[in-house]
Amino acid sequence: MKQILFILFLFSSTLQAEENFVEGIDYELINDDPSLYVSKKNNKIKIIEAFWYGCPHCYVFEDYLAKWETRKQGDIKFINMPVVFNKTWLLHARAFYTMKELDNFKDFHKKFFYAYHEQQRTFASKESVVNFLVSQGADKENVEKNFSSELVSKKVQEANYMLETYQIDSVPAMIINDKYKISGRMAKTYERMLEISDFIIDLERKSRSK
């Protein structure tokens, strides 16, 4: 079974202003079909963050993403996408999409990440996931219903398909408009991954205005 490659990000306190990023070095073109460039809903630029709850770099990256999201313009549609490489990751993906069906998703999402990395709760079973969400205020019957639902199964299946479509082999990764991929290997730092994302977003805005 394919194993995920964790990228060790280097922390950098110095940001390079207006850096010119280069395709093939800083980001990768993964699809040149123009029909896929723009999210069809409201014609927004789609940004996907591929992640896994057990990835320590994804956990740290969450704070960077949260601040970055607050600065985004209204033409951005941001999506978290859990990746699936084995049964444990599948379980965590089901947990993610279960939380998406609950009120206060962002709160549950943040607490789940925190519990995994700060409290060493690896969530290796459905029971451990359900018990945790219930301990955080979720209704047990609602959690169990959603966890085993066709909707959650479909969303996990779609995420698994996108894993291959986007050629994801490391996390975290950013996918922009189904067209560009930024991996940790290319970005090298958390800050730079978001700088490259901004650069590509500007490219997409300019291409749409032509």
Regions found by a protein language model. Name each.
Residues 62-69, 92-96, 109, 126, ...:
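Extracytoplasmic/secreted envelope proteins and their assembly/folding machinery
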Residues 71-101, 106-134:
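Structural microenvironment flanking redox-active thiols in thiol-disulfide oxidoreductases
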Residues 135-210:
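C-terminal cap of thioredoxin/glutaredoxin-like
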Residues 1-7:
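Sec-dependent signal peptide recognition
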Residues 54-57, 84-88, 114-119, 151-152, ...:
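Solvent-exposed loop/turn segments at secondary-structure junctions
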Residues 7, 11-90, 160, 164-170, ...:
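Extracytoplasmic thiol/disulfide redox context detector
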Residues 58, 88-89, 122, 186, ...:
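Alpha-helix N-cap/helix-start motif
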Residues 57, 104, 139:
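Short phosphate-engaging motifs
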